A protein has these predicted regions:
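Zn-dependent metallo-beta-lactamase
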Residues: 1-56, 60-63, 235-239, 261, ...
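Active-site metal-binding loops of divalent metal-dependent hydrolases
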Residues: 2, 50-52, 95, 118, ...
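Divalent metal-coordination and catalytic microenvironments
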Residues: 39, 49, 87, 94, ...
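Structural motif
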Residues: 44-46, 89, 111, 188-192, ...
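Metallo-beta-lactamase
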Residues: 56, 68-82, 86, 116-170, 176-254, ...
């Protein structure tokens, strides 16, 4: 039995370029999607990331949220014949403002899965205010409810299975506790890689401000070293057939290169390239 990640679109946000691409077009504003991933075909439906709480909360980072009625997570799930209560597991690549904002819509018998180091890091103040209080307080409440949260210790244990065909591993990038979610598909391994990659065109394909052969460009929003970020991207390009970031369309990878771009289902219809993102006045 093969699994298929689907993309429920959870909205858009306007991001200052420096955050997404280190040193590139500083001060310009770029509109980016905020995706979640619904994994179907396994023993239980699994959701990866829940988007941001509402448009207003994005203003705390000076960003504009663009979340409409059709983007609401319950409406996106309904497109697949599912209710909030049908989701058995929510896996979080990390807990930033645009990734864990809807957990409180789900019942406590939906288990939220995250790397323990990410929970620790979220309350350290190091990347405040990217971890908003309402989102983190809800996760604290889940700690005291039976089976409502599952902590992984990926830096120590290595990969941990969630359901057959789906497992998590430490990302080693973006935040200190970020994790990747790996899915077995009929055409190879798909890796939901959070914010390790923001933009394939700038970071991988076009090598913006990068001179060395096979050298990826890191984002401008990370807690660790640039070498660590580069190594984490190289690991993704070396090990997986499909890469699914949260803020760009999925890509098919061969020989560490992007050979195609996919739409809302992986595996699925593919185009060779995608145009660069649109820019807006700051």
């Amino acid at each position: 039995m093969w699994l298929a990640p689907e993309i429920p679109s959870e909205g858009w946000t306007n991001m200052v370029s420096e955050a997404g691409h280190n040193g590139h077009e500083c001060g310009r504003v770029r509109r980016v999607p905020v995706y979640g991933f619904l994994i179907l075909g396994g023993t239980h439906p699994v959701l990866v990331d829940t988007g941001y709480r509402d448009n207003a909360i994005m203003e705390s980072l000076g960003m504009r949220g663009l979340q409409f009625h059709e983007n609401m997570i319950e409406n996106q799930l309904a497109r697949h014949g599912l209710k909030l209560s049908d989701i058995r597991y929510i896996c979080h690549t990390h807990l930033h403002i645009d990734h864990a904002g809807k957990d409180d819509k789900f019942p406590m018998n939906t288990t939220v899965v995250l790397n323990r180091r990410e929970m620790e890091f979220s309350v350290s103040g190091i990347m405040y205010p990217q971890y908003p209080k309402p989102d983190i307080m809800h996760l604290v409440e889940r700690i005291y409810e039976p089976e409502a949260i599952r902590f992984l210790d990926l830096e120590i244990t290595g990969a941990e299975e969630i359901i057959p065909g789906v497992w998590c591993e430490a990302a080693g990038a973006h935040t200190e506790g970020s994790m990747n979610v790996i899915v077995e598909t009929a055409e190879g391994l798909a890796c939901i890689c959070g914010d390790v990659i923001y933009d394939f065109n700038d970071q991988i394909v076009n090598h913006v401000y990068t001179n060395n052969h096979m050298e990826p460009r890191v984002t401008g929003n990370h807690a660790g070293s640039k070498r660590g970020e580069k190594a984490a991207i190289k690991k993704l390009l070396n090990n997986y057939k499909f890469l699914l970031p949260i803020h760009d369309r999925p890509a098919k990878i061969e020989n560490q290169q992007v050979v195609g771009r996919l739409n809302m289902t992986v595996p699925g219809p593919m185009t060779e390239t995608l145009p660069e993102r649109h820019w807006f006045a700051a």
